Amino acid sequence: LGTYPLAVCGASMAESDSQAYFLPFSAKWGSDNVRVGAPLLPFTLAKLRSGSKVGALIDAANDQDFIRDVAWAMGENKTIEAQDGKVVFSAGPDWVPVPEDATIRAVGGEQSNVSIIIDERIMLKIYRRLRAGTQPELEIARFLTEVARYPNTPEFLGALEYVTDTGEHTALAIAFSFVENQGDAWTALVDGLDRSLEDLTLRQDKKATVESDLERLYTFPLDLAARLGKRTGEMHRAFATPTDDPAFASEPISEDDISKWAQTLRDESDRVLGELEKRMVSLPEAARHHVATLLGVREALNDRIAAIAATAPLGIKTRIHGDYHLGQVLVSKDDVIIIDFEGEPRRSLAERREKSSPLRDVAGMLRSIDYVASAAVDRFATRKGELPDQVVAVATAWRNRANRDFLSAYLDAVQRTQIC
């Protein structure tokens, strides 16, 4: 792309397949770029020299000029010839033109990809780990934006892909509309519940009931759970939008589906319990106790999985989020925005694109809500050095109430459908 080489770097692992990573390069000439304290020094890969000139070779994902060029190329639907294929920039119908003086800023936090905000209107996500094949996030973003018109996810704006001469696609980057937000729902709920538990211990009314504590302390977190249930149900209705596209057309759940899902559960259960059993002797005593308890119910787990395998098929399977938890939800004013449709990172692209029961997403979110209560209680105990029974009781009641509110709102949103 202009003067920026778009490189793919390979990494070979001793016990796994080789991996490919997208690493665009940018050359920054001038001694100021290699001095101690240079702004781009943390992203410098090597020192450059050409005659008397010196400079830095940096990761171009951190070069504002490169980001502007990527945005320009998307808007122009530019194609660049490449080895054994081509690099294709494409803009969706809602593409937002980027001015030359557009502001560029990176999104902080631990991420496996690079997220950049352009002109406070576009969020550019550059994929680091590359996988050949259709990227679920890319096709889902297009479907939800252009077909289902689902409003509670960022609009798809554009994409950057490498397309081989044989037609195989590899997603390099994707652009969405930028949504102003107050952070993710996980942080909002854990922080809110933690503050509420702290307030509980400071109150003089020690005889307050658990239910009154919930009503007086947790209005915001409880409202958020109901709103999230509603938006989740609407997302699943969007995925069930009638379409001729075989990648998104809903299908009846079959006996083979039930059998396959049950076998996947069985395999994962055996793998996890087997690993725990092997490592048990090296665990701390407290952890060994919990592992022993879990291993003691292995037969009950197998019985539960067998019951699932015997369940009669009911409802439809559709595309789903696939990695649904509170960290994938942004709090935006008094609403929620659902993001990150890449699917579970440890699964192949083909597995992530498989249709499944929408209730898989529901189960993932209920588990995430349960984790909120545990995280808030753990944070309280670490800070205080003690854990009053009232604190545990209120956190547990919050979890139960949040789950009920989420499920009630979800079921209201999907009523009169074949989703469940």
Residue map of PLM features:
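Short, Gly/Pro- and small/polar-rich lid/capping loops
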Residues: L1
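An alpha-helical support segment within catalytic cores of ATP-dependent transferases
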Residues: F89-A102, V272-T318
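Conserved ATP-binding subdomain of kinase catalytic cores across diverse folds
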Residues: Y4-V281, H321, L326-C420
